[in-house]
Amino acid sequence: MKKIFLVLILTFVYVENAFAEDLLKALKQAFHNNAELNAERENLNVSEQDLKITKSEYLPSASITSSKSQEDTNKLTNQSGGDATISDVNPLTTSIKIEQTLIDFGRSADYKKKKIGIDLARQKLLKKEQDIIFKAIEAYSGLVLAIEKEEINKQNVDLKISQLQTDKIRLERGQIKVSDFSQTESSLAGAEAQYIQAQNEVVSSRLNYENVIGTLINENSLQKSIKSFVKIPISLENAIELSKQNNHDVKIAQLELEQAKKDIIIAKSDLAPSASLSLERSYSEDLSSTYDEREKDILKATVSWPFFSGGKKFATIDKNESIKARQRLLLDSAVRNNLTAVTSAWAN
């Protein structure tokens, strides 16, 4: 629930200079170097390239083809059955072809889906940024706390050792009983165990810090002093409205539902006709024993209607309908979870 108001917290939190310099430096380091965050940025780049690929389907395609063959005629007869003169040829053919798709009912839906994909990738990136910033703050404060606990436990062990030495002298003088001295030894053993645990927590917290934020050069530079002033919504209704606008889980579910709708349109378009137009110019040399060169232009219009393919396309439509229903249920669940979370956070 802390994450719900993280944007507001980051906007309205003010800290003392020493803490701000170190914490903000750590947050900046995490923002630029965190592996999960960089992976999400690459995912956004992938979505942008997918959109470019889809745009290319609206543009004509051009290709150059060249082929050379060797033709050896073993036998050649004329109409009367006699042998004809054999002239072997080695034709060389080069062609240039330009083709443009004129009608494709799924092309527009695919383009819109890819545009939604960019918005979806951006929302996931924003969500990951907030998650990493939140984890970085937890890692920073967790390491500061672990170091302080280690120091407190170290001082406690030193105190117990001093007390043990004092009680040993008192035992020799008969001022305390053996049972009292044993209790002091037991207390020292407990303090040492807590100190070892605190040392382990420092190691664990340091590893977590370096995993989330990056390399830690000097632990002594970490500061714990902080004064924060957080602006919170004025009412529960205001909090719910803000969460509807800013909750990334809800936005992601909405965008995934829109993508599922486009998938249905794309699947249905596979059953619709498509049309293309192409222009090809070819050049041939040593074409045959009769002709040496040929230059030919071919203008071709093609219409295709794949109305049946063994039921595969209809099954794909049914599958995408089920995916859309699932995404709608996930969106409803995200909205309810968001409302429950905000209400619970406000009550606490």
Stretches found by the model and what they are:
Residues 21, 131-245, 256, 345-348:
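Periplasmic alpha-helical coiled-coil/stalk elements that build and connect Gram-negative outer-membrane
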Residues 39-54, 128, 132-153, 162, ...:
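Amphipathic alpha-helical coiled-coil segments
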Residues 38, 61-84, 88, 99-127, ...:
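Small/polar (Gly/Ser/Thr/Ala-rich) solvent-exposed segments
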Residues 19-67, 73, 216-258, 306-307, ...:
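Bacterial Sec-pathway N-terminal export signals of envelope proteins
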Residues 4-13:
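Sec-dependent N-terminal signal peptides
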Residues 60, 92-96, 239, 297-303, ...:
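Hydrophobic, lipid-facing positions within transmembrane beta-strands of outer-membrane proteins
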Residues 22, 29, 36, 103, ...:
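Surface positions of alpha-helical coiled-coils, especially the charged/polar e/g heptad sites
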